């Protein structure tokens, strides 16, 4: 990630920037040696994105791992894997609008239809809202004016379509405007069978609530572009010294959000009631059942600049009682039999429902979670079937599952397991 304003530059264009430090796809030969395969894999064109998160995941259900990349000043890019390690950019085929100040992502089956959905975390902007409402823009601007509001739509929830690809539905609107957002995690915190979402918020909360954010939209983006500009660099340095000397905030005082999934039809924001509406600026989020009691806990980091610069790690134990939801979990060993569990898909069939999850790395914001999967089952007291599809195409049924417990999974050896 290349920081905006460095050397008097700003990402250009602000809605499709591809002018940052390069990303790499490195192939491991099994002996600790890596080869740059970015261009050979078809990933050269957009490698200059200012990316924050990326995951290999089976997005189209064909058994191989596709690639999704979420970037600031761009949004989401989606690549289909042809099964031989060659990727094709299918962003425009799979989503109608990929644009956002992309910060993170998470994958979950939010409407319990047996397909993985994608939540991209973006940002909203009170300044843009005011400008759009008043119909104000620079008369000399050559940018597409619609991109201001599209880029500041906020979070975009893409629901998986039966025929492939994704679409935004009204469910996306109920989770879109969480603030200046960072890490996120989807987990069934109340075990009702529908994944909820926790989102970290806030950039710089300073002593003053006066916010710098409007300056970008009114001035900064018109002064510089992606080319090094010493005069612009001096201007920005002087400006930041002045505004920070006056202790301006920048995307400050935005509490974290907890969105409870209401049966796949809407989300209800309840962070304050659950005691996790953290006001300090936060970054990383991981959701994990740390104590094995069947209730998913939270791990959150803060990055604070006032009244004292500090970083903290906070662990929030889930104490929710009375929900009555049953659950089942599966834990995968790391690299047993020489295999990585990343990309393994688990389907659980119960009470006429099919729930799905994948072992995924690289989601949230600069975070890594354990190789485990947790399903809330609601009132169901048994599951009819559980099955795993491994990244190499092998499938197996999980025998002797126990609900309200974590079930250990053995990674298969390199031989057919049958179907």
Range-by-range predicted roles:
Residues 27, 51-61, 80, 102-112, ...:
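Beta-propeller blade termini
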Residues 5, 79, 129-133, 208-211, ...:
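Short, solvent-exposed loop/turn and secondary-structure capping segments
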Residues 74, 124-127, 204-206, 304-307:
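Short glycine/acidic-enriched loop and turn motifs that connect beta-strands
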Residues 18-19, 47, 71-72, 98-103, ...:
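Active-site-proximal structural scaffolding
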Residues 62, 66-71, 118-122, 197-201, ...:
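Hydrophobic beta-strand segments that make up the repeating blades of beta-propeller
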Residues 1-49, 80-100, 132-179, 214-279, ...:
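Blade-edge motifs of beta-propeller repeat domains
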Residues 248, 261, 266-282, 291-419:
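Gly/Ser/Thr/Pro-enriched helix-cap/hinge segments flanking short amphipathic alpha-helices
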Residues 110, 116-124, 151, 155-160, ...:
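Extended catalytic-interface subdomain
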């Amino acid at each position: 990630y290349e920081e905006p304003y460095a050397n008097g530059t700003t990402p250009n264009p602000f809605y499709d920037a591809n002018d940052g430090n390069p990303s790499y796809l490195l192939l491991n030969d099994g002996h600790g040696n890596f080869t740059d395969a970015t261009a050979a894999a078809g990933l050269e064109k957009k490698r200059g994105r200012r990316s924050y998160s990326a995951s290999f995941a089976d997005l189209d259900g064909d058994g191989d791992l596709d690639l999704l990349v979420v970037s600031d000043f761009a949004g989401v890019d989606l690549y289909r894997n042809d099964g031989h390690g060659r990727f094709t950019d299918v962003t425009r085929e799979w989503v109608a609008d990929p644009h956002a100040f992309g910060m993170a992502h998470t994958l979950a089956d939010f409407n319990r239809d047996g397909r993985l959905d994608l939540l991209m975390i973006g940002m909203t902007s009170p300044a843009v809202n005011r400008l759009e409402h008043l119909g104000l823009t620079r008369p000399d601007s050559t940018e597409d004016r619609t991109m201001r509001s599209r880029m500041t739509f906020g979070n975009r929830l893409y629901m998986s379509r039966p025929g492939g690809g994704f679409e935004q539905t009204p469910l996306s609107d109920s989770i879109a405007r969480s603030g200046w957002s960072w890490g996120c995690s989807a987990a069934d915190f109340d075990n009702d069978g529908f994944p909820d979402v926790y989102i970290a918020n806030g950039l710089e909360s300073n002593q003053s609530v006066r916010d710098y954010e409007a300056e970008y939209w009114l001035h900064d983006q018109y002064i510089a572009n992606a080319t090094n500009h010493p005069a612009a660099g001096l201007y920005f340095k002087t400006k930041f010294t002045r505004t920070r000397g006056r202790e301006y905030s920048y995307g400050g005082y935005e509490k974290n959000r907890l969105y409870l999934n209401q049966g796949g039809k809407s989300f209800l924001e309840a962070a304050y009631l659950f005691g996790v509406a953290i006001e300090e600026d936060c970054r990383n989020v991981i959701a994990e059942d740390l104590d094995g009691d069947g209730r998913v806990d939270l791990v959150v980091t803060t990055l604070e600049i006032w009244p004292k610069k500090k970083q903290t790690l906070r662990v929030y134990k889930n104490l929710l009682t009375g929900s009555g939801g049953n659950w089942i979990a599966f834990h995968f060993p790391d690299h047993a039999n020489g295999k990585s569990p990343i990309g393994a898909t688990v389907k659980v069939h119960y009470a006429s429902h099919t729930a799905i999850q994948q072992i995924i790395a690289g989601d949230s914001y600069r975070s890594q979670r354990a190789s485990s999967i947790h399903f809330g089952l609601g009132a169901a007291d048994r599951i009819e079937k559980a099955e795993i599809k491994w990244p190499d195409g092998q499938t197996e049924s999980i025998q002797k599952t126990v609900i309200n417990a974590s079930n250990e999974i053995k990674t298969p050896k390199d031989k057919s397991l049958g179907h």
